[in-house]
Amino acid sequence: MIDLHQLSIPRRRKTVKRTLVIFASLALVFMLAAPLFAQSYDPMKFKSSKPQSAWKIALVPKDATNAWFVRMEVGVKQFAKETGINAFQKGPAKTDAAMQAQVIEDLIAQGVDAICVVPVDPSALEPVLGEALSKGIVVIDHEGASQQNCLYDIEAFSNQGLGETIMQELAKMMGQKGTYTTMVGNVTNASHNEWADAGVAYQKAHYPNMTLLAAEPRVEIMDNLDTAYQRAKELFKKYPNLKGILGTSSLSVPGTGRAIEELGLKGKAFVTAVGLPNECAPFIKNGTVDGVLHWDPRDAGYAQLATAVAVLKGQKIANGLNLKAPGWTSMKFAAGSTKVLQGQGWITINKANVDTFGF
């Protein structure tokens, strides 16, 4: 008589075998992928054995066409000229995290020695930056304090301090009362959201007669000038009591300023943000905007490259680091961090000085 139970044993063995193969395959995948996820790297181990003349350092902005990053490239070219190092800027044609990741993939394939990056979305870049680090490529971030796969992130200032200062400027314009909202380039942009969060927290602690717009507390403009204009126009029409916009993108002021003028809301609605002098000048000069906050992207680009060079030289990074750019000459680690370095780089732009910058 045939024992049906015995006939099922080979089948069970095959099932167990398949299960073991699957688990082994998954384990291999995770082992191979390990460099792509956050690891702890010792910056001192990234000292280059090559002569400085052979180094290649790339800076990857969010968007190669954005005026902010066009200005940043001026600093990259200045650094290359002054040091003789092959430093260059290469970025996506628009603000897109996937496109930015592809640019970085291409640079890894080219065998660059260091990648400096201003991330569109830090979390989206973790895999590709992890790959770069695992191959011995120095990674330096700017405006990416939450980035895990980088050796250092350099900031022109404390993100909290800037956010609070933007709010102080907006509150002054609004007479410390009324409804406002926040505007960010991208909701995935770490720095933009930190500035906005700090501004809101400061308002709640210091300006009780100001109120954050509950229906739309954070507006995304995709770092696009036309989108900033359209969204601002929609907001002011939809919410007649809306009195102010706290912006974080450099396009917040020119976009919102245009909307304020077209809707006849000058003196009734207000905006301030970080911004470029030339882009904001018309609105500052005609009184639509009192002032904006700014740091020079040229100096930010220069400072990123200087940080990468310090690591490639095997220099120990410590408080007081001088990156040889205005506002970046005495860097200090953020409280509780061994990765985020902060300078003293912001400037308030107003009618008195808007024409003195030349960009």
Question: Where do the protein language model's features map onto the residues?
Answer:
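A residue-level marker of the well-folded mature domains of exported/periplasmic proteins
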Residues: 3-13, 37-359
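Bacterial N-terminal signal peptides
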Residues: 23-35
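Positively charged n-region of N-terminal signal peptides that target proteins for export
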Residues: 12-22
